[in-house]
């Protein structure tokens, strides 16, 4: 079937009468998971998950002794923890949970030989969560024989681990420090690794005859770039006099960034970076853009990309599209989120502003080939389809739209489905039938049961981030939908919806399978004026349905309300000012009322969602800078979303919209599901 993106290009939304909304910006912050809070009843009924048989449900009950064992471990009372574990219904599992928590909290207290023995005999434990912590705990005091044995079991994944392995082999005379190959490797690892001060001093003392002036210069540079000027200053005292002036200048700039302008002429990359970073906070103009264009970084690519991101956005605002494109080039990145970001923006600017689809394809294709997660895959595939469509290659456009449409939980996957199916009803939980089949063995399923139970007890003990990380391991076991639904059912049945939601998010993004249990619907919304799908989508994105969630910025509850916003709404709704923090019903009432007010003000779903995340003040600025999405076609609205300067808000708008589509299908199963296009038009 041909895809007809052009059929939407002239559409625009209908504006509603606007009334004033609460103009309270909502600063964001990282969720804080491990602080104790008083639990209140949540306004949710018991969930109903269809198509799950009794055999597929995890048949676990609460064991107070397992909970006690974890509690004692948190207090560092190992004897009591082991005693409680022995009293439990499953002593082997309970003792494993104790050990997992000990490794997570402080692996340096456990001998490497014991860590190896534990992981070998408990192969269900998601070791990739703990290996970096274990490596980071290794130091000069670690027994070199144990260290070498450990790295025989788990080869080092960090420069720190590689350095200490080489150091141990040198100490054990398994590596000859007199050989240039060993000396070169040691120097390279030291130059690119940060240690604590006492470790650095031991390294210098032991290997001072190995390190060269070039090593010192590169190590000083590394430390300065990584915000450790204190030890860099100590190292500078070892430099010959002719190298000290530049090192002194860089150290001064590191401590006093505002002085960077004095040393611009030194042509040093760090000084130029600091100068331009300072400028980005006060004066982003043509000179700033020109200066950035002239620099092709030799390292620290992610830091430079953040600056270039600011520069190309300003160039777009000035309609200097070529300069904007130039700033996306020579980024030096090879993988990861920043790489995907840089390649996508290069392709997007080439396609939408320079009208050069061939250049765009040259960016979107490597993005698709070098990313793994559904969000990035679907985004690259969708824009490849648009680029091929613009190049009048309908066959390849159709191919890439179909590729993108596999990722049914994502914004761009849903856009591709809308293009291919029009108004035809689509069950997003069907997805790719091949992906629904389990590729796992019985051993994988047995591992999953233990992982599910471990996450359950850790979450209840307020180790929420650790529980989420453990849940994120499950999709790697290649389970089918039935097995994933069973795990979600277990969490929902025990009122731990956040873990069911996290499992759903991870499954959708890593194994591309959507599960119904990850989309809770039975939340009481009182006096709602907008589709219930919106409120549920916001709750899912804000808190994972965790009514005790709070962020470092102070946002609280299911809808992550900020204190100022909640206080203003409390007066209007005649509720206590602090009720949003402890009463889930009040939190939902205030949050849904705020969304209603925002929609009443803007008459547009995109602006409403963006304002809920970033505040109405920012949204007003963006409308002035980038245009009014209420007067735009669908593709222009998509471009408007991608123009939002805050990455969190950009992603937030897309996430809420994609959640709305799924919820709309679940809440109104009797009629054709509204495609994401329809929600973009609201």
Describe each model-derived feature in a short phrase:
Residues 10, 15-101, 428-450, 460:
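N-terminal leader/linker segments that initiate helical-solenoid repeat arrays
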Residues 51-59, 82-93, 104-107, 116-126, ...:
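Solenoid-like repeat scaffolds
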Residues 65, 94, 99, 131-134, ...:
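TPR repeat positional signature
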Residues 68, 99-102, 134, 165-167, ...:
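Structural register within alpha-helical repeat arrays
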Residues 72, 138, 169-171, 223, ...:
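Residue at a conserved register position within TPR or TPR-like alpha-solenoid repeats
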Residues 75, 105, 141, 172-176, ...:
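Structural motif corresponding to the intra-repeat A-B loop/turn of tetratricopeptide repeats
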Residues 91-93, 100, 115-121, 294-304, ...:
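Catalytic glycan-binding domains that act on GlcNAc-containing polysaccharides
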